[in-house]
A protein has these predicted regions:
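Basic polycationic patches enriched in arginine
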Residues: 6-7
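Intrinsically disordered, low-complexity segments enriched in small/polar residues
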Residues: 16-18, 50, 92, 121, ...
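N-terminal glycine-rich phosphate-binding loop and ensuing alpha1 helix
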Residues: 21-89, 96-98, 137
Length: 154
């Protein structure tokens, strides 16, 4: 069937289709469960900017400017208190939703077990899997202690 201008106009004015074209803001998934064994502390929380800003503050600022609507931190339970106290929506001017998920050794897909001598987190893929329940749209993944620059979020 050949589309005519009138048919196209009718097609795009259907109310049920309007819901499908809603702009979805992406989520920024921040991998922050590592301890920084060579560094000796949580370097993702250390201030480096002129007013004590952490590297992650710059990354989230750039993501907000690019239209991101939510940031999810992948952390370990061991660091939960510190992260919840520092990384609040108010820290970012209320311009982005903040959530936390946990990367723990025993959070594995069914049928997998933790080897007795395993003490380190499983890595990037495992960390991303931890956010599956809180991300339901487009997302980008970054490391908390790396600086990417504004262009990375466009």
């Amino acid at each position: 069937m050949k589309l005519t201008p009138r048919r196209t106009e009718l097609f795009f004015s259907l109310p049920e289709l309007e819901k499908e074209f809603v702009m979805v803001k992406p989520t920024l998934l921040v991998l922050a469960a590592g301890m920084g064994s060579r560094y000796g502390s949580l370097k993702q929380m250390d201030g480096v900017g002129p007013s004590g800003e952490a590297i992650i503050d710059y990354s989230i600022y750039d993501a907000i400017r690019a239209g991101f609507g939510k940031v999810v931190f992948v952390i370990r339970h061991l660091f939960e208190k510190e992260f919840r106290e520092i990384f609040t929506p108010e820290r970012f001017g209320g311009k982005i939703e903040v959530d936390f998920v946990f990367q723990e050794l025993d959070k594995l897909p069914e049928g997998f077990t933790v080897p007795a001598d395993r003490v380190k987190p499983w890595g990037t893929n495992h960390a991303v899997m931890m956010a599956a329940e809180v991300i339901d749209g487009p997302f980008a993944v970054i490391n908390a202690d790396d600086f990417y620059g504004r262009e990375a979020y466009q």
